[in-house]
Amino acid sequence: MKFYCLIRFMIIANLYSSYQISLPGTYPSQILLDMKNSPLVRFNISTRDYKDETLWIRKNSTFVYIDTAVTTANVIFYLPIGQVRQMVFFKRPISRLLTSNNLVKFINTGSYANHTFKTELSPYLSKTNTPLKKYEIVVDQPTGENPPAGFGSLKPADFLNPGYKFVLTSELVGAYTKRSCFVDPMDSLVPIDYDHVRTIIFGSAGMEILMKMGITLASMTISTKYNPPIELIISAKYRNLSLLWPPRQQYEPVNKGTGRPHWIYLLGVYRNVSDSERDSYMNMIKSLGDSMDYHFLISRAHAQMLILAAEDRLVDEMHSFRNVIARLFVSLFAFIRNAFQSGYTSLNDIIEIEADLRLIVEGISSAAFRKDASTHFLISGTPIKDSKADLIKSLLSKVIRPISGHTRPLSAIQHLFLLRSAYALDIPRQNGSLSEQVSTVALSFIENIHSEAMRDILSWNTTTKHALYYAFASILQRPLTEWGASRNARRAILLASSMCTEEHVIATELAIQELYVKIRSNADPIHLLDVYTPCLSSLRLDLSEHHRIYAMADVVFYPDIQQYLKKKSHEGNMKEDDLETKAEYILTKLRSPLIRTLSAYASEVLSCSDQDLLEINAILILPVSGIGSYVVSRRAGMQGIVYTVDGVDVNNQLFITYTRMPCTTTIGNIVPTVLSRPSGKTCPYCGCVLLRYSADGNIRYSIYISSPKLQSELIAFGNSSIRRFNPTTAQIYGNSLLLYPNGTIVRILAFESERVTIISATYIATAVAGSIIALTVIVITVRMIIINMRYNYQGYNKVIDVDDDIRN
């Protein structure tokens, strides 16, 4: 038998015989609850006295907990989201996942006695000495000449050296920090008061993470479609948390008695010590106990993010994913705690924490949300809002405006600080002139880096990698409705593909392997952008192909990798192959999903192809014009002008298709030609792409002719200072094609007719000696054969003579 109870939530509770609760004073909302065992239903309605923290009402908020008389049947009801929106008895974020059946199925699994987890944690180091690598600069501290001040004291130049400027915490947060009532998202704990600073929600269609950050208390809830929900709570020491059921029972912290400055609580599914989920929970908790230094903790979060990207099993991915989220969570809490303890924080840290948050969330969306990465979202309540955000944008505009007008040059580190500030404030995603100016500055910086890379004078250091990421993000995150957004994005993708040469790919893979070895040895601080490469922003899709053995000649090997492999020598080649595989996983998972990028910036490719076949066969996509793109693939089948590339391995064929709307198919012909020298100041080759491939069907590079200077180097051929344009220094044999923006492709004869073969004297001497020896062997062999034939002939004649004598 089912019992239906009609409940109305208002401010004052009156209980009627029909189990109808009427709380007059607010607009009523009716919710029909389906309960079993109606005779045993009872209502526990408590009001909170402000002086008594054990009761539940505060500032017109009433918490209603409904249970049954039978202790084994207690449940907390989770209602449809439409009904939750009508409930006014407490304030909480609306979440389609946190109100799903996950909680109904899992939150009450097992006995309450098993909800407390115990583990041995290493001793807490209150003064952890962490080396801090801050983009090759020294982090300053406030002095008498440079004391912490309010936001109003900021100047435009401060954003070019943010580590020198310090802001008062009280000025930064102001009224945004408020006394609030903490309502456990899992509805398992008695609500308590705390000083709320910010709320962060992010996830995708199949996952949601909710973080509530305070000064002395913070909580994080992970809810997914296919795994039980988990909640972590960090609280000031000696502040007890109580369970709703059994009533008032104290909930034990996991790390009680370890000497750490905060207690850690865990809510989740746990049956017994052999439960596989328990190991995952313990790893999360251990990641929270190392230190309360923000820079150390966020470095651990970045390192765990790389481990997540390197995983190839879903089980390992989920464990690594939880560890990433846990470390990000405790990093944010440490930043807030330290800022309030010291009373100030640097402008650099304010910007860095927002940038790190967005960066890790985007990394998670690519590595962990791959199936629904396009649905990922981030809702971040930040103290930098309203008038403070307007002030910062105004100051940034004063810095960016002269740079976008090419009247003020900046160094790479200044570009990094400026573009990171725009990224942290989410300016690229906003409409208006400021995002356009940021995009202009970013594109100019990318073009300068591209020019240096083509001349082999670029140092791929930490500053360059980080600045390039923020530059590409400033362009690729702009709304497509904004003026010039699509044009700049297509140009940026071409520049990224141009820098993604075969030598660069293998050097990047080795750098990632070295970084992974350092992560496993707990060496220097790690940042996710330390592995960034323009290949991640390009549409070159063959990064995982093992065909670059000949490119290794120009790559410097890393001693850390050699030492690591030497220690693991008993495992043979397995460990080396494992490192290579992990590097390829990281490159593959951290790049933006192909279909999402194409739908935004090269929709003609999707319109003229089958998406499934495109993802399987395409190895390079070049959006060479505003209306057309080249697709290099292993198989034909796309609609457009289809070119068959001759002179390659039949088992590794290459097809090039020029796609544009409307999607019509024709057969193209690649014509060999000699490039003519343009007259005057014209630039007929600007916008073209030099595509070089090897005889085994592998793409070596696709150089984008982005300026008249590069055109001059291209037509200089043997006199070119750019080695990829010089046939005498192009190294490996192969063919070179020039792809025009209008869909025409020609083969450049200069790279075929001017090959230079260099034969060493040692090789010649060895060849001559070998020839002499071979000739001697042949002569001796022939003489032996002749002698043997003579002997046999004479013996045969003697036999004939004897036979004749017998007959006679």
UniProtKB/Swiss-Prot annotation:
It comes from the Viruses. Glycans are attached at N44, N60, N114, N240, N272, N431, N461, N719, N742. N-glycosylated, O-glycosylated, and sialylated. Residues 783-808 are intravirion. The chain crosses the membrane at residues 762-782. The keyword Transmembrane applies. Residues 18-761 are virion surface. One of its GO terms (cellular component) is viral envelope. The keyword Plastid does not apply. Residues 1-17 form the signal peptide. Residues 205-266 are annotated as: Interaction with gL. It is found in: Virion membrane; Host cell membrane; Host endosome membrane. One of its GO terms (biological process) is symbiont entry into host cell. Pfam families: Herpes_glycoH_C, Herpes_glycop_H. It is a single-pass type I membrane protein. Keywords: Fusion of virus membrane with host cell membrane, Fusion of virus membrane with host membrane, Glycoprotein, Host cell membrane, Host endosome, Host membrane, Membrane, Sialic acid, Signal, Transmembrane, Transmembrane helix, Viral envelope protein, Viral penetration into host cytoplasm, Virion, Virus entry into host cell. Interacts with glycoprotein L (gL); this interaction is necessary for the correct processing and cell surface expression of gH. The heterodimer gH/gL seems to interact with gB trimers during fusion. The heterodimer glycoprotein H-glycoprotein L is required for the fusion of viral and plasma membranes leading to virus entry into the host cell. Following initial binding to host receptor, membrane fusion is mediated by the fusion machinery composed of gB and the heterodimer gH/gL. May also be involved in the fusion between the virion envelope and the outer nuclear membrane during virion morphogenesis. Belongs to the herpesviridae glycoprotein H family. This is Envelope glycoprotein H. It comes from Meleagrid herpesvirus 1.
